[in-house]
Amino acid sequence: MAEKTYPMTKAEKEQLEKELEELKLVRRPEVVERIKIARSYGDLSENSEYDAAKDEQAFVEGQISTLETQIRFAEIIDSDAVAKDEVAIGKTVVVQEVGTTDKDTYHIVGSAGADIFSGKISNESPIAQALIGKKKGDIADIVSPATTYQVEIISVEKTK
């Protein structure tokens, strides 16, 4: 069975590698030290510090595993290889809802780099799926669970 690939820009992959390094070199040793200290308190059956540290260790190890997989199966997307005005991973797109003055700016990223609060949307999201491949001036149909609406692509630029 073929492994899933994770489309991303080179910059996104580098960011994941930094996060992985931080987890391995800083967070993991901190958690191990917390476990060691909590063990020194004695009885582990009623030791909430120990339980919390073990839970954090499981979380950190899960993050490490996820990042290692995403990095190992990264598919680097070169946004320069796509037409300058075409929406793709690594591009920033400004859209305006048809019939309104509402504008939104999205940075199209691979799923590993998605952060809606920073305007970074995954290439797998419904909005990105509707926009990818379109060009400035095109109309895209956005289908969300609540509604369907149209947006016009106002501008497309390489994300800085």
Swiss-Prot record:
<keyword id="KW-0238">DNA-binding</keyword>
<dbReference type="InterPro" id="IPR036805">
    <property type="entry name" value="Tscrpt_elong_fac_GreA/B_N_sf"/>
</dbReference>
<dbReference type="GO" id="GO:0070063">
    <property type="term" value="F:RNA polymerase binding"/>
</dbReference>
<dbReference type="Pfam" id="PF03449">
    <property type="entry name" value="GreA_GreB_N"/>
</dbReference>
<dbReference type="InterPro" id="IPR022691">
    <property type="entry name" value="Tscrpt_elong_fac_GreA/B_N"/>
</dbReference>
<keyword id="KW-0175">Coiled coil</keyword>
<keyword id="KW-0805">Transcription regulation</keyword>
<protein>
    <recommendedName>
        <fullName>Transcription elongation factor GreA</fullName>
    </recommendedName>
</protein>
<dbReference type="GO" id="GO:0032784">
    <property type="term" value="P:regulation of DNA-templated transcription elongation"/>
</dbReference>
<comment type="similarity">
    <text>Belongs to the GreA/GreB family.</text>
</comment>
<dbReference type="InterPro" id="IPR023459">
    <property type="entry name" value="Tscrpt_elong_fac_GreA/B_fam"/>
</dbReference>
<feature type="coiled-coil region">
    <location>
        <begin position="1"/>
        <end position="71"/>
    </location>
</feature>
<comment type="function">
    <text>Necessary for efficient RNA polymerase transcription elongation past template-encoded arresting sites. The arresting sites in DNA have the property of trapping a certain fraction of elongating RNA polymerases that pass through, resulting in locked ternary complexes. Cleavage of the nascent transcript by cleavage factors such as GreA or GreB allows the resumption of elongation from the new 3'terminus. GreA releases sequences of 2 to 3 nucleotides.</text>
</comment>
<dbReference type="InterPro" id="IPR018151">
    <property type="entry name" value="TF_GreA/GreB_CS"/>
</dbReference>
<dbReference type="InterPro" id="IPR036953">
    <property type="entry name" value="GreA/GreB_C_sf"/>
</dbReference>
<dbReference type="InterPro" id="IPR001437">
    <property type="entry name" value="Tscrpt_elong_fac_GreA/B_C"/>
</dbReference>
<keyword id="KW-0804">Transcription</keyword>
<dbReference type="Pfam" id="PF01272">
    <property type="entry name" value="GreA_GreB"/>
</dbReference>
<dbReference type="GO" id="GO:0003677">
    <property type="term" value="F:DNA binding"/>
</dbReference>
<dbReference type="GO" id="GO:0006354">
    <property type="term" value="P:DNA-templated transcription elongation"/>
</dbReference>
<dbReference type="InterPro" id="IPR028624">
    <property type="entry name" value="Tscrpt_elong_fac_GreA/B"/>
</dbReference>
<dbReference type="InterPro" id="IPR006359">
    <property type="entry name" value="Tscrpt_elong_fac_GreA"/>
</dbReference>
